[in-house]
Amino acid sequence: MIFGKCGRSPKGSTIDLYFIGDYGLTAMQPVNTAGAPPTVESLYYYLDIQERSEVRLPWFISVWGAGSQLEGEHYELLRRAIDLGGHIKTGLEMHFDPQDKPGNLDLIWQVRDIARDVGRPIASQAEARKLYGLA
């Protein structure tokens, strides 16, 4: 955020708010890891830091090492992030749970469905490029 505060963020810069689930980045069993847990309270903490920095860049969340995104706190975190104007980074590179093995498209559809549920439209490719200052 310091680059943004100094006006030196390149086009397309974003703020990625990382959350760490039960499986960390690649663990084969649940482990305690460093990082913010995937909760709405952690989201508010991150957003407070961003607000105090006075940096206004598009932001998104990514939940690393979590299982299904449509369960409990993970669902509420994604729903609240979308509702507050954030974006979601999803895909198999962040998903890890040895018992739950969705496809990449399944994870994308989960986020799409949450966005529709809160009334948030899905950006077209052109709209996304404009949003990130790449158009």
Predicted features along the sequence, with ranges:
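Conserved, mostly hydrophobic/aromatic
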Residues: 81, 111, 128
